């Protein structure tokens, strides 16, 4: 029994070298110079495009500008919203208390009064809200 276990262990240890498997990272010494590249016809091609270097402040500023522009476009575009189907929405001035469905008008919201005891769909308009112009 012991000989079978030892023989199995020896075979398992000898299998990778016999199959030509390489343990660990591949040796990459000497490939750093273009004249020693493996594929000389591909040495001029770059797989990754060169990136423009910018400072951290510039990157953060551009990211914030993109996020603000996207958020502003979503808020100021009520025409982009589709009217909801009448089966799954509450009409204007009807009770929306306890309903999990939205108001039919895309510019309306469920407005609650008296400690959320009385709720109905209503258009809330302000001077900055594009829905108030309708």
UniProtKB/Swiss-Prot annotation:
Q: List the disulfide bonds.
A: 89-104, 96-110, 103-121, 107-131, 112-119
Which InterPro entries does this chain map to? Agouti, Agouti_dom, Agouti_dom_sf
Q: Which UniProt keywords apply?
A: Disulfide bond, Golgi apparatus, Knottin, Secreted, Signal
Subcellular location per UniProt equals: Secreted; Golgi apparatus lumen
Where do the Agouti domain residues begin and end?
Answer: 89-131
Q: Where is the signal peptide?
A: 1-20
Please give the SUPFAM superfamilies that the UniProt record associates with this protein.
Agouti-related protein
Gene Ontology molecular-function annotations: neuropeptide hormone activity; type 1 melanocortin receptor binding; type 3 melanocortin receptor binding; type 4 melanocortin receptor binding
Propeptide feature ranges: 21-84
Q: Which PROSITE patterns match?
A: AGOUTI_1, AGOUTI_2
Q: Which Pfam families match?
A: Agouti
Query: What GO cellular component term, any one, is given?
Result: extracellular space
- Domain of life according to the entry: Eukaryota
Q: Which Gene3D superfamilies did the record assign?
A: Agouti domain (4.10.760.10)
Residues of the region (Interaction with melanocortin receptors) are 113-115
* Principal subcellular localization: secreted
Biological processes annotated in GO: adult feeding behavior; hormone-mediated signaling pathway; neuropeptide signaling pathway; positive regulation of feeding behavior; regulation of feeding behavior
Site keyed Cleavage: positions: 84-85
Q: Which PANTHER family does its entry note?
A: AGOUTI RELATED, AGOUTI-RELATED PROTEIN
Domain-related comment: The presence of a 'disulfide through disulfide knot' structurally defines this protein as a knottin.
Quaternary arrangement and interactors, per the entry? Interacts with melanocortin receptors MC3R, MC4R and MC5R.
Record function comment: Plays a role in weight homeostasis. Involved in the control of feeding behavior through the central melanocortin system. Acts as alpha melanocyte-stimulating hormone antagonist by inhibiting cAMP production mediated by stimulation of melanocortin receptors within the hypothalamus and adrenal gland. Has very low activity with MC5R. Is an inverse agonist for MC3R and MC4R being able to suppress their constitutive activity. It promotes MC3R and MC4R endocytosis in an arrestin-dependent manner.
| Name of the featured protein | Agouti-related protein
Query: What is the originating organism of this protein?
Result: Bos taurus
Lineage of the organism: Eukaryota, Metazoa, Chordata, Craniata, Vertebrata
């Amino acid at each position: 029994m012991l000989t079978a276990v030892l023989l199995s262990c020896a075979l398992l240890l000898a299998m990778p070298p016999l199959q030509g498997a390489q343990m660990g990272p591949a040796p990459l010494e000497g490939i750093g110079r273009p004249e020693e590249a493996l594929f000389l016809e591909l040495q001029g091609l770059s797989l990754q495009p060169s990136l423009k270097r910018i400072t951290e402040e510039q990157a953060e500023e551009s990211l914030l500008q993109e996020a603000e522009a996207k958020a502003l476009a979503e808020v100021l575009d009520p025409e982009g919203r589709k009217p909801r189907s009448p089966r799954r929405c509450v009409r204007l001035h009807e009770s929306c208390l306890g309903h999990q469905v939205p108001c039919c008008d895309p510019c309306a919201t469920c407005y609650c009064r008296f400690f959320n005891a009385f709720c109905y769909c209503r258009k809330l308009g302000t001077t900055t809200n594009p829905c108030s112009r309708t």
